[in-house]
Each structure stands twice: as structure tokens, then as C-alpha cells.
Amino acid sequence: MSDLAVTGNVESHVTDPHRRKDFLDPTEMKAFLEAAKAGRQGVRDHLLFLMMYRHGLRCSEAVDLRIEDVSFDRATLWVKRLKGSNSGTHPIEGDELRAIRRYLGLRKDNLPWLFLSERQGRLSRFAINYLVDRTAEAAGLTNLHPHCLRHSCGYALADRGVDLRTIQEWLGHRSIEMTVRYTRISQRRFNGLWRG
């Protein structure tokens, strides 16, 4: 995996096993994405979760994606944000682009939606909730929710040292205050600040 590779050391803030996780650390994310491949619609599910993670998509933004939002020539994705957030164009990494091509190559329809249900309709938010639960269980993870993938994106970017303004734009936040939460990460960021 290249962009937003699942490497690094993000500390989990979850101590109560019954509390829903805010985000997945890199090891958990890798296990989650691998588990997604094993389902009946593994190609679709892996791509869905990879895109939700890398682009910080909400459920409703993921189900609203259309094939025309992907530019294969420019290797970009048009992300239409909801809830008054700022929309924008995101680059798509090579492995993600190949996964999109592979998934579309398996389809035999002319429907505009990027993600389809097994009944050939647009995938629903309810279906994504179910898929997250099933995939989490297969990966040995508990108390996940789809929004956890969006949070995981923010935390992963912050852990890589990406500045807050860039994370704000990537996630489409209107206010920087919404983005600040992602700086609550490992103390590793502070190592060596005064060495020199």
C-alpha cells in the first residue's frame, strides 16, 4: 500500500472494551482491509473500505460515489462532501486505481454508482454498517463503526506529520477546530524536537 500506508504507531484511545473505537491503528487497519478481501464480495468490499479510509469518506459520501467521479486519465477522485463540508479533488494512488479497474471489470451493468449491492442497486448505508461489523469480526476487532475509517484517515495523516491545514482540506472540514482532534496521537511526534 502506498498513499496512507498502514505503517506507523498510532496509539488507541480505547480502554473500555464495550466502547466504540474512535479509529484503527495501522496494524488493525491492515488486518481490517485484509479481512475485507475474504467476503463474498471481497473485491468490492476491500475497495470500498480502502477508499473510505484513504479519502476519509463518510458512509453517505461513499454510497454517493459515481463512476464518473473517478478520472482514470488524471488518477483523481472527485469527493463530494456532505454535511456542509468542503468538496474537492483527491489524487488516487496506483494500487487504488488498479483496485477500481479490477472491480469495474467484474461488473456487467451500466449503472452510474461506483459501489453496488448484490442486487445491482446502489449500496446503502445500512449495508456498509453490516459489512463493517462482519469484516471487523473476521479481523478480530470489536465495536467498530463506519465513521471509524474516516477518523483513522485523520489520525494516520497526523501521525505522518501532515500539517493540520492539509488534513482539514483533505477531510473537507469547514473549521480547523474539527481537525485538531487528530493531533492527540503518540508522543513519538515530540521525540527529538530539541536535538540538534
Residue map of PLM features:
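Conserved catalytic core of the tyrosine transesterase superfamily
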Residues: 1-196
